[in-house]
Amino acid sequence: MGEDKGNGDGGKLLYCSFCGKSQHEVRKLIAGPSVYVCDECVELCNDIIREEIKEISPKQDQDKLPTPHELRAHLDDYVIGQDKAKKVLAVAVYNHYKRLRNASPKDGVELGKSNILLIGPTGSGKTLLAETLARVLDVPFTMADATTLTEAGYVGEDVENIIQKLLQKCDYDVEKAQRGIVYIDEIDKISRKSDNPSITRDVSGEGVQQALLKLIEGTIAAVPPQGGRKHPQQEFLQVDTSKILFVCGGAFAGLEKVIEQRAHVGTGIGFGAQVKGEADKKTISDTLLEVEPEDLVKFGLIPEFIGRLPVLATLSELDDEALIQILSEPKNAITKQFAALFEMENVELEFRDDALKAIALKAQTRKTGARGLRSIVEGILLDIMYDLPSTDDVAKVVIDESVVKGESSPILIYANNEAQTATAE
């Protein structure tokens, strides 16, 4: 039975049996057989239990490693297409975490790291694949941009800052960080500027590749605690990067030409040459599927760096159909996100099929892939999202092809079933 503050037990002042506060100092006293507990102590007990559950749950999760089939199924929920890349990633990630579970090698056989290199055009889903895997496995995830990295001692971001970012994501818990995933984007931008090693120092190209070598392969990185600056008297956090999965991604623009040059060597010229017609020409995506390590060396990555990324997955360019699917099918599809926003205003949002096709066509024209879809939808809905909170009785907003093309405003359907075209201010 709960005792409200101010209600005495026969005029007697009551106190919490745990913290000793009187009924006048708390909002609620709950009575038991000859004991009382206040609302503050109940809340404190709840917090303690919640913290203990959080500490136990990661250990329980570790016992259950999703199979490659399960990982692939999770990726299918969020990422459209890229079937071959999903399969490659699912197997590589499964093997990596299996290696961590069985740290003591049998018969002296040490398992190597399965770091991954993703090659694919902008907006094809490289980052999303890595991010989704980290979310499924409930491990810390961080992203780094290779273009901002420089060798230690030069102006720019030190490669060890990547590990610091990962630690920040898990409140500087080293054990958690060592099970994390790091995605390094724009890795193609740190390619060597020419095939021949230069006399001058290439601090943002080959120099960064050299600096990343040890980090990706596995080393003990010394990171200052809580993001402080390094100084000699400081105690560092020691992070073993051999347990961290590194995924590197890049568009590698022009790599298809390198592959074609290799493939066409020895085809001959003159009367004996084999003439290729239009039907024999391959798309860039098809050509990239034939990539070999030697092509990446020719492109500008050093052999040692390529050797640290043994798993190679190629992503294809997204066509109109794939972009339409991305707009509406995944669990967190863009149209579903905006529909949820409109639902908060008690308004239904509908995208007609012709609108989805027009949005996909716009993204293809901009050559931004899936990455550009959100900004297009934001632009289409800007005026209506501005006006809607101040407009009464709107039950539904309909977006069709003409709205996407800017030829008309969204159709508003009011609660009394009247349809009206919105007028943009």
Curated annotation (Swiss-Prot):
Any one GO cellular component localisation term in the record: HslUV protease complex
ClpX-type ZB domain ranges (all copies): 4-57
Residues annotated as binding ATP: 121-128
GO biological process: cell division; proteolysis involved in protein catabolic process
UniProt GO molecular function: ATP binding; ATP hydrolysis activity; ATP-dependent protein folding chaperone; protein dimerization activity; unfolded protein binding; zinc ion binding
Keyword Ribosomal protein: no
PROSITE patterns, alphabetized: CLPX_ZB (PS51902)
Residue numbers binding Zn(2+): 16, 19, 38, 41
Top-level taxon of origin: Bacteria
Keywords: ATP-binding, Chaperone, Metal-binding, Nucleotide-binding, Zinc
TM annotation in the entry: none
Function: ATP-dependent specificity component of the Clp protease. It directs the protease to specific substrates. Can perform chaperone functions in the absence of ClpP.
PANTHER family reported for this sequence: ATP-DEPENDENT CLP PROTEASE ATP-BINDING SUBUNIT CLPX-LIKE, MITOCHONDRIAL, ATP-DEPENDENT CLP PROTEASE ATP-BINDING SUBUNIT CLPX-LIKE, MITOCHONDRIAL-RELATED
UniProt subunit comment: Component of the ClpX-ClpP complex. Forms a hexameric ring that, in the presence of ATP, binds to fourteen ClpP subunits assembled into a disk-like structure with a central cavity, resembling the structure of eukaryotic proteasomes.
Recorded family membership: Belongs to the ClpX chaperone family.
Name of the molecule in the record: ATP-dependent Clp protease ATP-binding subunit ClpX
Lineage summary: Bacteria, Pseudomonadati, Pseudomonadota, Gammaproteobacteria, Alteromonadales
